[in-house]
Amino acid sequence: MQPLVMQGCPYTLPRCHEWHAADRFHHSSSLRNTCPQPQVRAAVTIPAPPWDGAGDPCLSPKLLNGTVGATGPLEPSAMNLCWNEIKKKSHNLRARLEAFSDLSGKLQLPLREIIDWLSQKDEELSAQLPLQGDVALVQQEKETHAAFMEEVKSKGPYISSVLESAQAFLSQHPFEELEESQSESKDTSPRQRIQNLSRFVWKQATVASELWEKLTARCVDQHRHIEHTLEHLLEIQGAMEELSSTLTQAEGVRATWEPIGDLFIDSLPEHIQAIKLFKEEFSPVKDGVKLVNDLAHQLAISDVHLSMENSRALEQINIRWKQLQVSVAERLKQLQDAHRDFGPGSQHFLSTSVQVPWERAISPNKVPYYINHQAQTTCWDHPKMTELYQTLADLNNIKFSAYRTAMKLRRVQKALRLDLVTLTTALEIFNEHDLQASEHVMDVVEVIHCLTALYERLEEERGILVNVPLCVDMSLNWLLNVFDSGRSGKMRALSFKTGIACLCGTEVKEKLQYLFSQVANSGSQCDQRHLGALLHEAIQVPRQLGEVAAFGGSNVEPSVRSCFRFSTGKPVIEASQFLEWVNLEPQSMVWLAVLHRVTIAEQVKHQTKCSICRQCPIKGFRYRSLKQFNVDICQTCFLTGRASKGNKLHYPIMEYYTPTTSSENMRDFATTLKNKFRSKQYFSKHPQRGYLPVQSVLESDCSETPASSPMLPHADTHSRIEHFASRLAEMESQNCSFFNDSLSPDDSIDEDQYLLRHSSPITDREPAFGQQAPCSMATESKGELEKILAHLEDENRILQGELRRLKWQHEEAAEAPTLVEGSAEATPDHRNEELLAEARILRQHKSRLETRMQILEDHNKQLESQLQRLRELLLQPPSESDGNGSAGSSLASSPRQSEGSHPREKGQTTPDTEVADDVGSKSQDVSLCLEDIMEKLRHAFPSVRSSDVTANTLLAS
């Protein structure tokens, strides 16, 4: 239905400010007052004044007064004539007033009726609001309003005619503005009454016109509002019906979902994909629900509220949609959790690696930890790994750290079954898992995937039964201990590949070639930064066993410089040059070569008898003395330092890890014969060393050497405390057994071992501190550095106290021979031999004290230098600490580095038992310098005064 457009009243009701007969009623009253009725004189006849157009007589007061004054009183006839004329005019005026009253009364009644009718219709129109939020009710309201508008439209012509009549009346009878003085007067003249009537008509006409315009405008607005509301309600109703149908279909699909526990593990990815497709398919429902809610909100703003039925339907749609969303999200999460926990890439299968009362749990970053429900404790290490570490303690009686480390790694290798894995198999697994990029950071799940594939491939290739969950879990545990002791859950791909390559069952040369290829560029060349990264990753293996001190410590810069001496001044090194350097078995990598020899020697039997324990045949390593004929020692006796009387192990010894040949026997015979004619002093001046020494000077790690894995700054707090405690206990045990073992025949082994194990700075024996590069140190908190500084200062105080104690003992030992010689002259001859023997013992004791004092003094200097370095790091801002530290360390290390650590030639393939003839000239110079220093120390301690001065000088330095 087209909206009814009603025309408003176009009439204006003007108000006239000029009244044409303004003084007519005034003249009449004046005339009435001027002509008294009791006395009438008709002496003179006065003609009737003419009428103007308004009907008032035109009587001039001047005329009347002049006439009366001139002639005296009027004649009765004249008075009668005047009176009659007045009566006639009064009658006419009365008739005219009655006619005006009748006309105004005819207008006032219709206007009053129109005003009342319009007010009633306005109330009826207001009663139609507010509209109900239901389609049927709004349609009914629309029909009612259409009838209402027809009624109003039909009344329009009558209202227009009445308003036109009022307009015509007001145009004929204008009125003036009502003055305040006139409005307050009680006596109103006829003229005023006429104006009041005109004014009243004008007011009624104005009110009626305004009400008519207002009603017609409201009718049009109401019609539009009803049309708009009906349109929105129809849209809401259709959308809700469509949404209800769609939600019913979705709920039907949801009802067909099987419980998670009834699904097959292999089908979990398919169900996850189906849930994702289901979620995408019903995503338009979200837009539909939003549209319905927006329409309902717009209706509420326009004061149209949905009916109870529609409100309930909309609420149910919202509830069902939210429930469907929650169900889909929970279902997807359950499927993903099940796939993560039980799928092929999950760690669920690893839960069988532990037995009751242990339970394998997973931290938020996917790192496993283990719960002992019986002891109510948790730990990072697998129970089997803890047992393995406890068995490694049995190997601590091995005197030589390279062999001790190799023996420990061999046990770890066999426990992890990595000795059965070839490097070729490992490379295939690495390629399958896209581990070509060494800088890629792996998480725990990726490591588990690689290890699982590795051990499954091992089962296929070897045809042996492997406990895959146990091997994977223990290998993961070992890799985390080595490269991620902070348990951050992240590990570089280079770290992972280095760990697997070092322990796999492959030749050393192949391992080293592969490791070099991982840091080399496309031209098979490597710069110092990448080589430092490789050596840094490799040194973490002995560091985890607490053996890093004997291999130059965690600082790999001296090893990098030693290797680049083979590059002939180029900034890069080639694979052949790297292998040439490694074949010399440098101090930082000697443990890898020894591990290979230990592996080969395990199955070897030598058909000879041990000269100490009488074991025959000798299994494993065989050590032949190159000083005495027919003296062979088994690996147990040699490595633990056992020796029989007359068999000093500091003489040249040849190691064999394969059965000897006749040519080797003849060569050893000739060497032994030659050594027979050499004095003991010769062997002391030409000490044998089984590795290429690398001068370990105190310097910070190179800024280009990255940390092996992301580590938390507080992650190794307990390990550092444990390390300090073990080092202190070891030092105390050595101090206590130092004098008790001084008379043992194998004291030279202890001394060599002590020198071997303590030849590197104290900082190198700290795995947590030495492992971090300056770039990571700059980001550490100041509090962590202060803690490390406090630890180092404590150890410095311990070393200084021990240094003072040893100096005092040295003074006592120096004074004892003088007292013995002076008393020997007065004693009987039968005591001379006893005193001489005691003097020899004291001299030996003095020599050992001097050696140990020298070591402690070196440690003290290095520790003080490191403390100074740490103080500088604490005082410097982080942006400047790296560059300044690197420059300072380079300047500090250059003088000492230039003095030694040049590669030596190798005469034998057994580095721990080289012949003294093959020692280079550089090592002889170093030995002579060392001997000169010892002589100076001997002369520096003959008296208490000189020793105090020397001690003060050393401490001050």
UniProtKB/Swiss-Prot annotation:
Key word ATP-binding present: no
Sequence positions that bind Zn(2+): C610, C613, C634, C637
GO MF annotation: an example: zinc ion binding
PROSITE patterns: WW_DOMAIN_1, WW_DOMAIN_2, ZF_ZZ_1, ZF_ZZ_2
InterPro entries in alphabetical order: Dystrophin-related_2, EF-hand-dom_pair, EF-hand_dom_typ1, EF-hand_dom_typ2, KCMF1/Dystrophin, Spectrin/alpha-actinin, Spectrin_repeat, WW_dom
Entry function: Required for normal myelination and for normal organization of the cytoplasm and the formation of Cajal bands in myelinating Schwann cells. Required for normal PRX location at appositions between the abaxonal surface of the myelin sheath and the Schwann cell plasma membrane. Possibly involved in membrane-cytoskeleton interactions of the central nervous system.
Protein name: Dystrophin-related protein 2
Gene name in the database record: Drp2
